[in-house]
Amino acid sequence: MGFPIALMIDYVWKSPKPPPGTKRRALDRTHPDNFKYFRNWGFTIYRTYYGPESDESWNTLLQVLTQQTRLALGYHDTDRLRAKDWRWANFYKGDKATYPDLINIMKRLFRLFPREDPDRLAGLDVAGIRKLCLEEGEQAESEKNMVGTRLKFVLVADEAVLKDIANDIFVVKTVGYDWDPIQDSRSWGWMRLATGDLLEFWEMILMADEYSISKYYDIFFKGSEEDLEKHVWWGSASLSRFGDCSRVQTACKDDKFGRFRFDP
């Protein structure tokens, strides 16, 4: 299953503090007038390759990541997951009408924050991105735009990524910039993932933060760092695979075990 939608809403909800000595008033989080109290969630994405014709691949990558992540949120819109969302059952009193609203709020709040600068970013490898993020205060800078910066992951579009996009191979690199090679020795601190799996990855690191476990556990890799350049993330052991919800597929009436169904 995925990370509960109602807990995601808690994560991005930042209601104003009441005046001293007064009790905080509960606000309807699904009311349009209160949308201003939500903060965006997403990733900073660094572009490190500026070769010929790479602009088109870069723009395609940004569009695909945004569209697929929002589509993947549709995985949560099922009776089964709603029934398991204890936070929704308690806080929203089991009001079924609110559940699709919460999913749509998460869709609207997703953002990518691109960083482009050929003079400073061109040719940087993973280690260079980590160094840049630490030296230039990536966490504090990103906090101005979105929640979740304490998760300390960014996306990277390097030469390999953008050339893959040009060949209809849709992957992106995700880099943890607080990775410790001794403490987190089971992984290299970065991973290539299919663009449709970005939501699953975000839910994985959010869950790790929520339960105080290593966010690098689910991106472990036994091979060399060179071999990792050919590997694509297989997903989290703690979550169901739902990246397929972001892909065009054909539903089959006779498929009893498929994810998609025809409406009656």
Task: Enumerate the language-model features and the residues they cover.
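Acidic, proline/glycine-rich low-complexity IDRs
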Residues: G176-P264
